[in-house]
Structure formats: structure tokens, C-alpha cells
């Protein structure tokens, strides 16, 4: 088995959940097996970066990705003394001077969230926040323009596809200019992870056409049946139920100690 190391880097990295997931991945193609190492991440929240270092295993970089105009529209005031706009060189420095194999971008989603009213989402404050999506793509592309990142993964709330349609059109154009082919879809993290919760996300995947062949596939959904060691245990809280496509569970028949209406796998139900 041939071993290979791949490197990932994160924009708006938060506390590092995405980076931790990359670190756990062990992709295998034929007789080649790879493991991922994190080069770092960028965020504006110091507390989040402390968690990022703990989960990702490497320190992140405290950096504001707003342009000056975006900063003023979001905060309602001029930037403090000493503040400056981030540059492509700042991005390369945050990655330790290395070019990653994949970049994960999870820019703030509040402006496109259904939890925010349409009226509020159109205010200058939240329009500036939404524009970080485009800003991150531009900084990433310019940072490694001479040696493009092979794969870009961009995720956000599903409503970005409607409220942020104009931004996605610009992102598509920008990525095309940098040499990327783009695919957009939505997925449910609950289905992918075999969880009892539905958490839908918008997903954009961009591959550099000169570096990555057209062979990217969607993540397989996990089987929703319990593990062999917990087949008698309840997996779903009383307020939840299995995903609609899951046939491995049946309504609870009142097993002693069972607090969920959905528990044991059906006698004939393999996931």
C-alpha cells in the first residue's frame, strides 16, 4: 500500500469541526492510501481559534477578512487604528507558506439563514457579511494563483442559493477565471452521518480542471441501523425519528426502559 499525505486549509475556520473531520479521513484509491494534515485556518474570533488549535492540532491565524467597506457596513464604524485589509500574502503565511491540496470555506451564514427575516437580510450589515463568501474565494485564488489549490469545498446554509444568488453567480465566474469546474448541491448532514437530526447545507465543490479529473462523487449515506453492540438500545430521542428513507427501525413496542418511540431495528430491516 502506497502512503500519501494531503494538506487542508480553512477559511472562517471557527472552532475546527471541519478541520477535525478532514484529519480523521483516510481516503483510499486502489493501492494508494492518504491521510490529511491541517496547515491552519483563519478566523476573526480568538475563542474559536483556541478551540481550533485543540481540535485541528495546529494553531489558527487571527485575521479579519473584511474589506474596509465591508467592515464599515457591518460594524457601523471605521476600523480601529492599525487595522488593514487581508492580502493574499497573509493567506499564504497563515498556511505556513505551503499550498494546500484542499481548501474548506465556511463563511458566516447568518445573512442567508432562514432564521433572519428577508427584510433584515437586505440591510447593509448583513449584505456585507454575505459578501465574505466572494471575498474568501478571491483571496484563496490570488494566494495560490501560480499553483492553484486542486480542490475547494464551500458550504453554507441552503438559502444562500436564493438570497445569495447574485454572489453565487459571481463566485462561479471567479472560480472559472481561476480554472475551476464547479458543482453545486445540497446535502443533509443527518443523513450522511446516520444521525437523528436533519441539518441541511448548501455545498459547492470546485476542482481545478488541470489537476483533478472529473471523478468527484457524492458522499455515501451511512446505514442508519444501530451497531451490533447496541442493537437493543434506543438511538433516537423521544422528540425525533429516523430519517424517512430509513427502514431499519420500527415504532417502539414498549420495551422496559425505552424512552423513545423509535428504537430497535425491525426484524427484517437491514439499513
Predicted regions and their residues:
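S-adenosyl-L-methionine-dependent DNA methyltransferase catalytic core
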Residues: 1-38, 49, 174-177, 201-271
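Core alpha/beta nucleotide-donor-binding catalytic domains of modification enzymes
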Residues: 2-148, 158-169
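Generic beta-strand hydrophobic packing signal
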Residues: 39-41, 103, 152, 185, ...
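Residue-level signal for pocket-adjacent positions within structured domains
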Residues: 60, 107, 182, 187, ...
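Active-site donor-binding loop signature of nucleotide-sugar glycosyltransferases
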Residues: 63-65, 189, 220
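Short secondary-structure transition/capping segments
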Residues: 83-92, 100, 187-205, 230-242
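Conserved Class I SAM-dependent methyltransferase catalytic core
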Residues: 129-206
Amino acid at each position: 500500500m502506497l502512503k500519501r499525505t494531503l494538506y487542508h486549509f480553512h477559511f472562517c475556520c471557527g472552532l475546527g469541526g471541519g478541520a477535525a473531520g478532514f484529519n480523521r479521513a483516510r481516503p483510499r484509491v486502489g493501492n494508494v492510501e492518504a491521510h490529511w494534515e491541517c496547515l491552519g485556518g483563519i478566523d476573526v474570533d480568538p475563542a474559536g481559534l483556541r478551540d481550533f488549535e485543540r481540535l485541528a492540532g495546529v494553531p489558527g491565524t487571527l485575521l479579519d477578512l473584511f474589506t474596509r467597506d465591508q467592515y464599515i457596513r457591518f460594524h457601523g464604524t471605521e476600523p480601529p487604528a492599525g487595522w488593514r485589509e487581508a492580502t493574499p500574502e497573509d493567506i499564504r503565511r497563515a498556511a505556513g507558506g505551503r499550498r494546500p491540496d484542499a481548501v474548506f470555506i465556511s463563511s458566516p451564514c447568518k445573512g442567508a439563514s432562514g432564521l433572519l427575516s428577508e427584510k433584515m437580510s437586505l440591510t447593509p450589515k448583513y449584505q456585507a457579511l454575505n459578501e465574505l463568501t466572494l471575498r474568501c474565494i478571491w483571496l484563496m485564488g490570488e494566494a495560490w494563483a501560480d499553483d492553484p489549490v486542486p480542490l475547494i469545498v464551500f458550504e453554507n446554509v441552503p438559502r444562500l442559493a436564493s438570497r445569495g444568488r447574485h454572489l453565487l453567480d459571481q463566485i462561479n465566474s471567479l472560480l472559472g477565471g481561476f480554472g475551476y469546474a464547479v458543482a453545486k448541491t445540497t446535502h443533509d448532514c443527518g443523513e450522511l452521518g446516520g444521525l437523528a437530526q436533519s441539518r441541511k447545507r448548501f455545498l459547492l465543490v470546485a476542482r481545478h480542471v488541470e489537476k483533478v479529473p472529473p471523478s468527484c462523487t457524492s458522499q455515501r449515506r451511512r446505514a442508519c441501523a444501530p451497531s451490533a453492540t447496541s442493537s437493543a438500545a434506543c438511538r433516537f430521542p423521544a422528540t425525533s425519528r429516523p430519517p424517512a428513507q430509513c427502514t431499519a427501525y420500527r415504532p417502539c413496542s414498549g420495551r422496559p426502559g425505552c424512552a423513545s418511540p423509535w428504537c430497535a431495528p425491525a426484524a427484517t430491516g437491514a439499513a
